[in-house]
Amino acid sequence: MKKLVATAPRVAALVEYEDRAILANEVKIRVRFGAPKHGTEVVDFRAASPFIDEDFNGEWQMFTPRPADAPRGIEFGKFQLGNMVVGDIIECGSDVTDYAVGDSVCGYGPLSETVIINAVNNYKLRKMPQGSSWKNAVCYDPAQFAMSGVRDANVRVGDFVVVVGLGAIGQIAIQLAKRAGASVVIGVDPIAHRCDIARRHGADFCLNPIGTDVGKEIKTLTGKQGADVIIETSGYADALQSALRGLAYGGTISYVAFAKPFAEGFNLGREAHFNNAKIVFSRACSEPNPDYPRWSRKRIEETCWELLMNGYLNCEDLIDPVVTFANSPESYMQYVDQHPEQSIKMGVTF
């Protein structure tokens, strides 16, 4: 059997493995479909993650260096690529009561022919309803971050909303904002194909940031007022600078991206200083949730799964391209790392 592994920075390969015996609380799944994570996973793949030599210390709530003799946060050769899988249970441990052999399920896991997952008190292992879409299922993870971005920005009926970066998270945020009652939804992305999909699913306008004063265009489209909410998913300094320029007085930027380091020139003066801008850093998996105790990550996940399975969210167009597992190393390097403009969220069939 084979699994997709990062053997070196920016190098993916299929590697042989043998399954271990499952424990009493586990199930083994034969994977049929899957998808990688195009955001933070790619930072890891490029060896650009702070987690390689540092760890986020929960007690101090800050990054601290790993001890010199401790394992690195990412070890190439062992680093398995992939985020979500859909497949059929082929083995159940003796303590498993909520699942059975033959069940079709979705869960977090790497791109490999089989995965072993805890199946006792694990709400993240989801049963696939009859006839449900695997493409919607593998968007379970990005949907959570899109939902938290929309909720943390307090999008309300009638708001002018901008979504910057139309990858999977941004595309789902477009759908959620429009369905939440935003009167004008504007997408920002340089890739025409992504903009076309966003328009099909709720965007009233899309802007190409290349050669465009995005902030001024947002003000023009909103009668000089600016956006009540801007959801920033790209992580680029220019995008945040444009968002500060296009934000309405007292508006909110919901910063969803795991940002890249900002080069010299980023300016928190100018419009940011004059327009009482608010920046909220949004992360679905940071607990306690800003709306705790009413909301938690579990509630976000439960809600996202329901919306994905009942068709409220439509992610069929977002899984593009779809490649075979046999071709996944080359496809990962091309579509996820080297030419991300050629994809939104890559799907993998087994």
UniProtKB/Swiss-Prot annotation:
<dbReference type="InterPro" id="IPR036291">
    <property type="entry name" value="NAD(P)-bd_dom_sf"/>
</dbReference>
<keyword id="KW-0479">Metal-binding</keyword>
<keyword id="KW-0560">Oxidoreductase</keyword>
<dbReference type="InterPro" id="IPR013149">
    <property type="entry name" value="ADH-like_C"/>
</dbReference>
<comment type="similarity">
    <text>Belongs to the zinc-containing alcohol dehydrogenase family.</text>
</comment>
<keyword id="KW-0520">NAD</keyword>
<protein>
    <recommendedName>
        <fullName>D-guloside 3-dehydrogenase</fullName>
        <ecNumber>1.1.1.-</ecNumber>
    </recommendedName>
</protein>
<keyword id="KW-0862">Zinc</keyword>
<keyword id="KW-0119">Carbohydrate metabolism</keyword>
<comment type="function">
    <text>Catalyzes the NAD(+)-dependent oxidation of the hydroxyl group at C3 of D-gulosides leading to 3-dehydro-D-gulosides. Probably functions in a metabolic pathway that transforms D-gulosides to D-glucosides. Is also able to catalyze the reverse reactions, i.e. the NADH-dependent reduction of the oxo group at C3 of 3-dehydro-D-gulosides leading to D-gulosides. In vitro, can oxidize D-gulose and methyl beta-D-guloside, and reduce methyl alpha-3-dehydro-D-guloside and methyl beta-3-dehydro-D-guloside. However, the actual specific physiological substrates for this metabolic pathway are unknown.</text>
</comment>
<dbReference type="GO" id="GO:0016616">
    <property type="term" value="F:oxidoreductase activity, acting on the CH-OH group of donors, NAD or NADP as acceptor"/>
</dbReference>
<dbReference type="Pfam" id="PF00107">
    <property type="entry name" value="ADH_zinc_N"/>
</dbReference>
<dbReference type="InterPro" id="IPR011032">
    <property type="entry name" value="GroES-like_sf"/>
</dbReference>
<dbReference type="GO" id="GO:0008270">
    <property type="term" value="F:zinc ion binding"/>
</dbReference>
